[in-house]
């Protein structure tokens, strides 16, 4: 019961990796930027909840600047992981950014994060790119929604689903996007 479980980037019990581990821990801390919704974690011992923050990575970076020793900071790999979270949630600093977002990114650069290496984390294979392109091409407009209903895509290309949905949101006049596909052959 002395174990601390730190839940990051979600407030919902249904989205944690292991509900069993969460329930067995004596103490729970939540760090999240999403609005509190249904099924949230009840009675956490510590909450860092900022719905106006760009990402959970931004919040973690801010916390790291105020805790521990000056020598106890993230290494390059950890800093690059946090920077990748900021880049992902802000779509390369184009959405939901503020001064705090850029300050967090600057701190991560001071910790050794290299933007070129972080960008490489987002490189896709030809299979993933082709799957995304096909899903975007299949999209049809209904009111202000882009809807793409695909056939089946390979499990190794499942990242293309979210990428296609994000790309569709960048089209002028699109307020929402939906992408539905069968992943793999298991039914």
Model-derived regions: residue spans:
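Hydrophobic/aromatic beta-strand patches that form the interior of the parallel beta-sheet core
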Residues: 6, 27-31, 46-49, 146, ...
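Hydrophobic helix-and-loop "lid/oligomerization" segment in the mid-to-C-terminal part
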Residues: 1-4, 88-187
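Short glycine-rich anion-binding loops that position phosphate/pyrophosphate groups of nucleotides
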Residues: 10-13, 34-36, 153
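Short alpha-helices
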Residues: 33-106
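N-terminal small/polar loop signature for handling phosphorylated ligands or for N-terminal nucleophile
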Residues: 1-24
């Amino acid at each position: 019961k002395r174990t601390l479980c730190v839940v990051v980037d979600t407030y919902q019990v249904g989205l944690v990796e292991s509900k069993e581990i969460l329930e067995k821990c004596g103490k729970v801390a939540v760090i999240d930027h999403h609005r509190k919704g249904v099924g949230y974690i009840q009675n956490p011992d510590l909450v860092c909840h900022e719905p106006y923050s760009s990402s959970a990575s931004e919040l973690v970076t801010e916390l790291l600047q105020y805790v521990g020793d000056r020598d106890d900071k993230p290494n390059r790999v950890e800093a690059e992981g946090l920077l990748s979270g900021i880049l992902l949630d802000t779509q390369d600093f184009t959405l939901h950014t503020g001064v705090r977002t850029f300050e967090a990114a600057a701190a991560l650069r001071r910790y050794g994060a290299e933007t070129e290496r972080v960008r490489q984390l987002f490189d896709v294979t030809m299979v993933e790119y082709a799957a995304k392109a096909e899903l975007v091409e299949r999209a049809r407009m209904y009111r202000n929604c882009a809807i793409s209903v695909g056939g089946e895509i390979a499990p190794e290309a499942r990242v293309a689903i979210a990428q296609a949905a994000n790309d569709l949101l960048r089209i002028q006049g699109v307020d929402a996007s939906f992408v539905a596909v069968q992943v793999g052959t298991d039914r």
